[in-house]
Amino acid sequence: MAAAEPDADPKAAIPVDLRRERRLVCVEYPGVVRNEAKMLQTLGGEESVSRIYTDPTKRLELYFRPKDPYCHPVCANRFSTSSLLLRIRKRTRRRRGVLGDEAHPQVTFNLEIIGIISTIYKFQGMSDFQYLAVHTEAGGKHVSMYDRVLMRKPEKEEFFHQELPLYIPPPIFSRLDTPVDYFYRPETQHREGYHNPTISGENLIGLSRARRPHNAIFVNFEDTEVPEQPLEAAVQTWKKACTNPIDQKVEEELRKLFDIRPVWSRNAVKSNVSVHPDKLKILLPYMAYYMITGPWRSLWIRFGYDPRKHPDAKIYQVLDFRIRCGMKYGYGSRDMPVKAKRSTYNYSLPITVKKTSNQPGTMHDLKQGLGPSGTDGPRKLTYNKYKLKDSVYIFREGALPPYRQMFYQLCDLNVEELQKIVHRNDGTETVCTERDGWCLPKTTDHLRDTMSLMILQTIRSERPALFSNTGKADRGKEQLMFESGEEEEEEEEEEEEEEEDFKPSDGSENEMETEILDYV
């Protein structure tokens, strides 16, 4: 705190104590604040403000009618700043019984720095239109419709058949709150006899650039033949991209992999070969074709090799495995020690703002790779830069998968008990079906049940607090055994009915669509 003396020079510097440890957040509230409690209520309360502050990508929302569930908020942008919050007190001391010039009051100013403001929220956008569900009665009185529309308690059937006035909301609300300049231009005037061109793909301008074709060949399970060689466009594309010795070495390594094993998943390739993802998109169509449906769906198969004609190809079949969760298994989705591949919270909304993250600074040794005389010597190439861990395609007992949904090939199930289930019919394979391939019917169901029990035991060892109630865990285990169809005949009948209308799981379709889009 510092006080200015009455006779001091107004331009003189005054020493002030600065509390560096006290950091504050400023909100430029678009209104006069007379009640702090009501002001915080319009911002969602202290809990909401704290939650938004912890996420730098969130915008602070202000609801002018916090009790109205349909109130459209005004959003504030977040900025970094280096400001001070000052408290200035003006004290006036009047002199009594003094006449003349000396009768002027004595004024002093007390200055105090409360803290440093490092973050500020500014409401720079425009407030959107607020549409109210209000009905005008015959006498001109406005009545709110919320009490008649909103369900605040369980209602009877008559509630849904009551007569209400027609209220049509606007067809669309604005997603942006910042104004933009729109330059109106007159309509284009064509000469007499001009006709608009026919609508076709050549005359349309897309919103984004066209995808680069990677010339992959897709094969369905019903197709009779498989391709023997890649497309000529795929060959030329790879020859143009293969410009250095590293690319040639990657090509040789991938060719050796397909010689050893004719069927590979993309994750398995990434775990065995260090290659840039963009180069892999071009190299895979040059080496193999892609199976869309059947037991080898979402896998890359060597040209000329047809797994439907080789019973020993059953070890390359794919298994869509998902970690089961729920009350009957003893843990929920939030308690699982395995993260999800995707999340809806990763998508941007109008109330969020994208900010580039600060890139950490890196230092490179310019002498690295040089010989003793300073000349360019043999450099140590980082071949493992793009390699993935083998856990993305290999299942091991006692280890949790990296994701909640995994696509394993049967040969990558490194558990003896699982391999016994796969090889139960070795030498007696007769027909290859779309669901089970060369394996016995319901082999995938038995594999999933066995793997789920292993996952349950692993989670129990890593998170024993989730299974403090042993009875619940035992019930979950019994439920797993019941789902496998070993105790009830009715369950077997239901599985037989489901087998007739077999379709690949939604998860596998989503995974294939993601990979197929890279080659369209």
UniProtKB/Swiss-Prot annotation:
Residues 484-501, 508-520 have a biased composition (Acidic residues). GO terms for cellular component: nucleoplasm; transcription factor TFIIIC complex. InterPro entries: TF_IIIC_su-5_HTH, TF_IIIC_Tfc1/Sfc1, Tfc1/Sfc1_N, TFIIIC_tauA_Sfc1. One of its GO terms (molecular function) is RNA polymerase III general transcription initiation factor activity. The modification N-acetylalanine is found at A2. The keyword DNA-binding applies. One of its GO terms (biological process) is transcription initiation at RNA polymerase III promoter. Coiled coil: none annotated. Residues 466-520 are annotated as: Disordered. It is found in: Nucleus. Keywords: Acetylation, DNA-binding, Nucleus, Transcription. Belongs to the TFIIIC subunit 5 family. Part of the TFIIIC subcomplex TFIIIC2, consisting of six subunits, GTF3C1, GTF3C2, GTF3C3, GTF3C4, GTF3C5 and GTF3C6. Interacts with BRF1, GTF3C6 and TBP. PANTHER family: GENERAL TRANSCRIPTION FACTOR 3C POLYPEPTIDE 5, GENERAL TRANSCRIPTION FACTOR IIIC, POLYPEPTIDE 5. Involved in RNA polymerase III-mediated transcription. Integral, tightly associated component of the DNA-binding TFIIIC2 subcomplex that directly binds tRNA and virus-associated RNA promoters. This is General transcription factor 3C polypeptide 5. It comes from Mus musculus (Mouse). The gene is Gtf3c5.
